[in-house]
Swiss-Prot record:
Its main location: cytoplasm. It catalyses: N-terminal L-glutamyl-[protein] + L-leucyl-tRNA(Leu) = N-terminal L-leucyl-L-glutamyl-[protein] + tRNA(Leu) + H(+); N-terminal L-aspartyl-[protein] + L-leucyl-tRNA(Leu) = N-terminal L-leucyl-L-aspartyl-[protein] + tRNA(Leu) + H(+). HAMAP family: Bpt (MF_00689). It comes from Acidovorax ebreus (strain TPSY) (Diaphorobacter sp. (strain TPSY)). The keyword Acyltransferase applies. Keywords: Acyltransferase, Cytoplasm, Transferase. GO terms for biological process: ubiquitin-dependent protein catabolic process via the N-end rule pathway. It is found in: Cytoplasm. This is Aspartate/glutamate leucyltransferase. One of its GO terms (cellular component) is cytoplasm. Belongs to the R-transferase family. Bpt subfamily. The lineage of its organism: Bacteria, Pseudomonadati, Pseudomonadota, Betaproteobacteria, Burkholderiales.
Length: 246
């Protein structure tokens, strides 16, 4: 284990995992750097780690630490000057009738079934489409930081919440929101993911938070490069956040 001198965050230690198959770029091996012990990573420390390029998966806080590859670039949307483009405005208008309900992390069978439908449609054969309830819970519903579960439902005929369409897990940081994971009904062309990012930007603006952290942008990965369409954004390159010029 090694300590990072540039992270004055209590007594954290950091270790590198063994190589494992990369989830985003075929035929590549990935490694992660994991922050420990997890019980010291409360919200203030976690906010500092996210600002330095870390992410959270359940109780694990990590960042890419790959040999000879730096394709994963942390990206955050700058909230105050953000303006949606034409396609994003269409997605916002299309789903304007969705009702959002913010909850503490909790297990509901309806959420889990939606998660499985999403994984089977979007990531079939990747392993997560076979996640058990325990695996789902460990991945999304365990946290020591300020986390929320947001469910999005259609408006029912009587004005009450209707059919579940999307669930999003997010963390509330000192300087923004961090999009942990989102899954939704796999309807072709529905643009639920775009709508969700726009919703988080709106929430951050309401809360007076300057950033929405979208995780890692990977230019070569179609699953990840959509994030660059949210402008303006900043990329963390060589240890510094830099405003995108495009």
């Amino acid at each position: 284990m090694t300590q990072l001198n540039d992270l004055p965050l209590q007594s954290l230690q950091f270790y590198a995992t063994a190589p494992y198959p990369c989830s985003y770029l075929p035929e590549r091996q990935a490694r992660s750097q994991v922050a420990t012990p997890s019980h010291l990573i409360q919200n203030d420390v976690y906010s500092g780690l996210v600002a330095r390029g870390f992410r959270r998966s359940g109780m694990f806080t990590y960042r890419p630490y790959c040999d000879g590859c730096q394709a994963c670039t942390p990206l955050r949307v700058v909230v105050d000057p953000f303006k949606p483009d034409r396609s994003q405005r269409r997605a916002w208008k299309r789903h304007a009738g969705l009702q959002a309900r913010v909850l503490r992390l909790c297990y509901l069978p309806e959420h889990y079934q939606l998660y499985l439908r999403y994984q089977n449609a979007r990531h079939a054969g990747g392993g997560m489409d076979q996640d058990s309830i325990d695996q789902y819970t460990q991945f999304l519903l365990q946290s020591r930081v300020n986390s929320r579960l947001v469910e999005f439902r259609e408006t029912g005929a009587d004005g009450q919440p209707g059919t579940l369409k999307m669930v999003s897990i997010l963390d509330v940081l000192e300087d923004g929101l961090s999009a942990v994971y989102t899954f939704y009904e796999p309807e072709p062309g529905a643009s639920y993911g775009t709508y969700n990012v726009l919703w988080q930007v709106q929430q951050a603006r309401t809360l007076g938070l300057p950033y929405v952290y979208l995780g890692y942008w990977i230019e070569q990965s179609p699953k990840m490069n959509y994030k660059a369409r949210f402008m303006p954004h900043e990329l963390r390159i060589d240890g510094r956040w830099q405003r995108s010029k495009s």
